């Protein structure tokens, strides 16, 4: 006999994907009800659909009431992870978007790309960069706007010349394409009109990406971007508390806007972000910042390094790392033996046998998506990095690691892409950089955080990353794929060499690191995309 009457089934089908199976999707429209249902689920022997009929169907405010009681009265934060929201933010600066993307857990992001989309278009006669509130009401307003306008002017007027240079240096005639019969042919040998159009599309996309890659170095951190965010309620609440407590007016204003929009979908989950509890958290975070500033003034001395570098500053002896990795590799399948005893057993294995074990696990990886087992999380590395800010933005997307960064400044000099020199605009490029530096130094004296907005992507930026070998494998293999930006490919390759030097045995697990240099990085990727498009 069915658990539900026909009338109940009819009602339930508006909120669940089925009424008679043990696996079902929760499709009730309100996120707060979805989360509350799952949370109630853990404290009753009723089925979820029965809970819905008994408690939620007749009371439209049941979910809100539940969260108000659980979150405010009991402080059970984990229940806020059971509901989520999706928001889009358009027209925020690269300073603000990085602050948002600093949050690692509970979020997924997708940001507007600087290699596929150009920033040359104006809105109402103005380039798309943030007119930061505190700067614009200061005596630096004109200097700031003029510096950003200069960056965009040079960027805009050189898009077509850069595209022309890249296409002259790397002609479409040099490349092989698949025709409709599946044969590889040089472009001049293609006959079919559709094949010709298809291959021109591939080439145009790849060359445009390379041109924009080179020119993005000119863009200032004030450049406006768009980002889509999916996250759970708890993550959003923490993000909002951080942004409400920010020293930057743009970030505080964004916090208000995000909160207003989330109140329409997951209000119960973000209620505390700026109430008395949220403000206590904001004070705590600002106290941490103040303490760090004091300690820095007390104990840190030296001059900023010029140029870029990658240093491996912390790692363990490979002998110890191998023992821990192998112990973890066999732990799950071991016959009820505790980890410390397994470690003792592994230490007695001859080194040659240990090398064979690591090589075995490397051998069974057939592509880079075959992640190494979790055992390879047992050893980690700390890298000290100084790379251009544009490149940092790509590495910043990796979240299964510890990344700390400093304020964006002009202290570390800047990187000039080879294509800028080849195009003959190095002088103009340098003038942009020097102008930004001069304006930055003036703003910095009174508004050090706000001064970041005028700094170009080309300027070198300091940060460190601590990551385990499993995550290092993912990051380095992904960031050395042929279609990757030259800047981050080279940094990832250097990271690999440093790991290989210190851990020659364990580094064998990094099987899919591409050390080759490519002229037109996006070409093969665009070819694969076009071939898939043809099949659909």
Protein language model annotation of sequence segments:
Residues 1-536:
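A conserved ligand/cofactor-binding region detector
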């Amino acid at each position: 006999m069915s658990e539900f009457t026909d009338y109940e089934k009819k009602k339930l089908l508006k909120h669940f994907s089925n009424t008679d199976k043990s696996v079902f999707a929760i499709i009730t429209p309100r996120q707060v009800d979805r989360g509350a249902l799952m949370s109630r689920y853990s404290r009753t022997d009723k089925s979820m659909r029965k809970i819905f009929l008994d408690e939620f169907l007749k009371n439209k405010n049941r979910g809100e009431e539940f969260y108000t009681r659980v979150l405010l009265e009991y402080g059970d934060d984990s229940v806020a992870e059971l509901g989520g929201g999706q928001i889009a933010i358009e027209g925020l600066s690269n300073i603000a978007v990085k602050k948002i993307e600093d949050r690692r857990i509970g979020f997924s992001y997708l940001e507007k790309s600087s290699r596929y989309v150009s920033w040359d278009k104006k809105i109402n006669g103005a380039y798309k960069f943030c007119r930061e509130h505190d700067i614009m009401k200061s005596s630096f307003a004109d200097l700031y706007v003029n510096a950003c306008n200069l960056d965009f002017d040079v960027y805009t007027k050189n898009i077509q010349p850069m595209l022309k240079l890249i296409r002259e240096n790397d002609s479409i005639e040099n490349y092989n394409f698949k025709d409709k019969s599946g044969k590889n042919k040089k472009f001049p040998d293609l006959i079919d009109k559709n094949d010709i159009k298809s291959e021109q599309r591939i080439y145009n996309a790849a060359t445009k990406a390379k041109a924009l890659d080179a020119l993005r170095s000119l863009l200032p951190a004030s450049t406006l971007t768009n980002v889509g965010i999916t996250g759970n309620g708890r993550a959003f609440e923490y993000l909002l508390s951080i942004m409400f407590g920010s020293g930057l007016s743009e970030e505080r204003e964004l916090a208000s806007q995000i909160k207003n929009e989330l109140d329409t979908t997951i209000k119960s989950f973000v209620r505390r972000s700026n109430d008395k509890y949220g403000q206590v958290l904001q004070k705590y975070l600002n106290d941490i910042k103040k303490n760090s500033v004091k300690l820095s003034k007390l104990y840190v001395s030296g001059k900023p390094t010029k140029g870029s570098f990658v240093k491996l500053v912390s790692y363990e002896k490979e002998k110890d790392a191998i023992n821990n990795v192998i112990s973890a590799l066999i732990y799950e399948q071991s016959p009820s033996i505790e980890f410390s005893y397994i470690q003792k057993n592994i230490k007695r294995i001859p080194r040659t046998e240990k090398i064979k074990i690591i090589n075995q696990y490397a051998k069974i990886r057939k592509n880079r998506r075959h992640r190494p087992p979790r055992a390879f999380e047992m050893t980690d590395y700390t890298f000290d990095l100084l790379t251009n800010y544009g490149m940092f933005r790509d590495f910043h997307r990796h979240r299964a690691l510890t990344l700390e960064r400093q304020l964006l400044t002009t202290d570390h000099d800047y990187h000039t892409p080879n294509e800028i020199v080849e195009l003959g605009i190095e002088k103009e490029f340098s003038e942009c950089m020097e102008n930004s530096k001069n304006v930055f130094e003036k703003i910095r004296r009174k508004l050090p955080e706000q001064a970041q907005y005028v700094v170009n992507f080309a300027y070198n930026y300091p940060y460190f990353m601590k990551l385990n070998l499993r995550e290092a494998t993912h990051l380095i293999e992904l960031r050395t794929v042929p279609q990757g930006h030259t800047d981050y490919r080279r940094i990832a390759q250097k990271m690999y060499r440093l790991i290989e030097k210190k851990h020659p045995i364990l580094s064998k697990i990094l099987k899919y690191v591409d050390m080759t240099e490519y002229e037109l990085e996006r070409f093969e990727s665009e070819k694969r995309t076009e071939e898939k498009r043809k099949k659909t």
